[in-house]
């Protein structure tokens, strides 16, 4: 068994975010001044949290956010940032570059909830889930290869098994976990990933979490954290357990 922490962070604000425009995959924006400030604040919040691996979407807004967070960290500033195209934002097809409110109106006209609506030429939720599965498989393999010395025999793991609500600290859930991956990605992609974790993988909902928050769009530089346990053998690596510590945390905004 190999237990590791997984902290997922949405990129900082871009001008398109501020203007209410859909970026998707065609608009590869850099961070706005506010987005840089948000990323610096996220980096300061996580500065004493040890990461052993960093994965990032290869879109500019995510890479810039990851670089700022890692630069502020006291233990992982020299880690390789592994750029993975499986982490890029959901494609919104012909709606990209247009206003978010216009896509909401398109979904309403089609009689569908916004998260489930697919604009022409866009990606369906199921297509994004396939990319999520591809990324998880690659991440599991990379972590197992990088941390073979942390694999334990039997059904126990070094993860914190506490069922108490998180204390609101930056290292909640990962203080006793020697392997910890940082992933920096995108809002719609993260929302679908949460659906996959909670609905498909049956991850328990954290105590005290408002169910309406489960699948809401994470704010810019908002954070989600999970503890994942892998079953490792000479022929296979498989998910054994997943627990959620928190989702959509934005405590570092207080420092802005």
Swiss-Prot record:
Q: Where is the active site?
A: 11, 89
A GO BP entry is: regulation of pentose-phosphate shunt
Protein's cellular compartments? Cytoplasm; Nucleus; Mitochondrion
Site (Transition state stabilizer): residue numbering on this chain: 186
Q: Please give the SMART domains that the UniProt record associates with this protein.
A: PGAM (SM00855)
Under the heading Pfam families, the entry gives: His_Phos_1 (PF00300)
The record's catalysed reaction(s) read: beta-D-fructose 2,6-bisphosphate + H2O = beta-D-fructose 6-phosphate + phosphate
Q: What is its EC number?
A: 3.1.3.46
Region Disordered: start-end pairs: 147-170
Record flagged with keyword Flavoprotein = no
Q: Which UniProt keywords apply?
A: Apoptosis, Autophagy, Cytoplasm, Hydrolase, Mitochondrion, Nucleus
Q: Which molecular function GO terms apply here?
A: fructose-2,6-bisphosphate 2-phosphatase activity
- InterPro entries named in the record: His_Pase_superF_clade-1 (IPR013078), His_PPase_superfam (IPR029033), PG/BPGM_mutase_AS (IPR001345), Phosphoglycerate_Mutase (IPR051695)
Q: Which GO terms describe its cellular component?
A: cytoplasm; cytosol; mitochondrial outer membrane; mitochondrion; nucleus
Superkingdom of origin organism: Eukaryota
Q: What does this protein do?
A: Fructose-bisphosphatase hydrolyzing fructose-2,6-bisphosphate as well as fructose-1,6-bisphosphate. Acts as a negative regulator of glycolysis by lowering intracellular levels of fructose-2,6-bisphosphate in a p53/TP53-dependent manner, resulting in the pentose phosphate pathway (PPP) activation and NADPH production. Contributes to the generation of reduced glutathione to cause a decrease in intracellular reactive oxygen species (ROS) content, correlating with its ability to protect cells from oxidative or metabolic stress-induced cell death. May play a role in mitophagy inhibition.
The UniProt family comment states: Belongs to the phosphoglycerate mutase family.
What is the protein name for this chain? Probable fructose-2,6-bisphosphatase TIGAR A
Species annotation: Danio rerio
């Amino acid at each position: 068994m190999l237990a590791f922490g997984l902290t997922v962070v949405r990129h900082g604000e871009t001008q398109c975010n501020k203007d209410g425009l859909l970026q998707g995959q065609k608009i590869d924006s850099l961070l706005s001044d506010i987005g840089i400030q948000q990323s610096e604040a996220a980096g300061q919040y996580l500065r004493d949290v040890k990461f052993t691996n960093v994965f990032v979407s290869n879109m500019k807004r995510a890479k810039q956010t990851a670089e700022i967070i890692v630069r502020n960290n006291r233990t992982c500033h020299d880690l390789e940032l592994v750029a993975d195209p499986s982490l890029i934002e959901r494609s919104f097809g012909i709606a990209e570059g247009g206003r978010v409110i216009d896509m909401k109106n398109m979904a309403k006209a089609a009689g569908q909830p916004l998260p489930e609506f697919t604009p022409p030429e866009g990606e369906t939720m199921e297509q994004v889930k396939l990319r999520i599965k591809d990324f998880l498989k690659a991440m599991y393999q990379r972590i197992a290869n990088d941390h073979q010395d942390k694999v334990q025999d039997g059904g126990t793991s070094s993860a914190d098994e506490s069922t108490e609500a998180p204390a609101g600290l930056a290292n909640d859930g990962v203080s006793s976990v020697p392997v910890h991956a940082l992933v920096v990605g995108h809002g719609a992609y993260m929302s679908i990933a949460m659906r996959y974790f909670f609905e498909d993988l049956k991850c328990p909902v954290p105590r005290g979490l408002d169910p309406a928050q489960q699948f809401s769009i994470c704010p810019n530089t908002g954070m989600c954290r999970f503890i994942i346990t892998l079953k490792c053998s000479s022929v296979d690596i498989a998910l054994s357990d997943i627990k959620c510590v928190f989702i959509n945390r934005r405590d570092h905004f207080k420092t802005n």
